[in-house]
């Protein structure tokens, strides 16, 4: 494509989880003319195997952590080899899924950016908060009761009560419709049963944390049952 340097986000398109499901990875690829200046040592072929090449006179030298999460790179590389040109088809379906959800939810949540999206789009619970006191956090917590992992919330920061929706290419239409129904049900509950949303999740083993108490009285050290155990850990 004519680029000198390309940064790959291995999240999603190249198989890696993201955020709490991470780790992600961001390898950087360069043209051959730039390769001599890369951090050293470089991994180079040596017969049937590989070796570290330290003889790099033009290299910028060692860079802390420059190899990154190596296992992530291997997994993504294998993923690319396995799917080949089908990666484009997978990306097309991810974009289609995102626009399908956008079209089905735009009438019940605020839509800060009213246009076709790529692989993700942003909704806002601004009206729910203004009219019923229900926040993006409440929506996310209630989704857990529907068996759905909550989306990223409060990002981007410029969108109040943001909900970033990012379906993948692997979701069936039935699962997409299930997500839509859950989101629409939650919007209806905001008007009829706001306190239910404020207490959500109600069916999970772990309930909602008391965020006010956590902020005012944080517990940053584990409370041991036996003083000897605490002393052993502190002294190594």
Where are these regions (language model features)?
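Compositionally biased, intrinsically disordered low-complexity regions
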Residues: 4, 49-51, 70
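PLP-dependent aminotransferase class I/II
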Residues: 64-75
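Active-site nucleophile and cofactor-binding loops and adjacent substrate-binding regions
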Residues: 14, 18, 68, 154
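Conserved PLP-enzyme active-site core in the AAT-like
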Residues: 1-47, 133-134, 161
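Non-catalytic terminal extensions of PLP-dependent enzymes
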Residues: 46-63, 79-236
């Amino acid at each position: 494509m004519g680029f000198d340097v390309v940064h790959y986000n291995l999240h999603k398109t190249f198989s890696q989880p993201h955020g709490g499901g991470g780790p992600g990875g961001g390898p950087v690829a360069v043209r051959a003319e730039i390769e001599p200046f890369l951090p050293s040592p470089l991994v180079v072929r040596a017969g049937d195997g590989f070796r570290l090449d330290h003889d790099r006179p033009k290299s910028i030298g060692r860079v802390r952590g420059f190899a990154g999460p190596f296992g992530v790179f291997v997994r993504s590389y294998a993923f690319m080899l396995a799917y080949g040109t089908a990666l484009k088809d997978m990306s097309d379906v991810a974009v289609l899924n995102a626009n399908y959800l956008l079209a089905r939810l735009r009438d019940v949540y605020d839509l800060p950016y009213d246009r076709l999206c790529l692989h993700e789009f942003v909704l806002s619970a601004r009206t729910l908060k203004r009219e019923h006191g229900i926040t993006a956090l409440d929506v996310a917590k209630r989704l857990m009761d529907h068996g759905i992992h909550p989306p990223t919330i409060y990002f981007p920061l410029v969108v109040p009560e943001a909900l970033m929706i990012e379906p993948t290419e692997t979701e069936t239409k039935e699962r997409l419709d299930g997500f839509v129904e859950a989101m629409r049900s939650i919007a209806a509950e905001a008007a009829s049963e706001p306190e239910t949303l404020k207490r959500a999740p109600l069916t999970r083993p772990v309930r909602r944390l008391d965020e006010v108490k956590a902020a005012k009285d944080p517990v940053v050290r584990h409370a041991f049952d036996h003083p000897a155990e605490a002393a052993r850990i502190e002294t190594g």
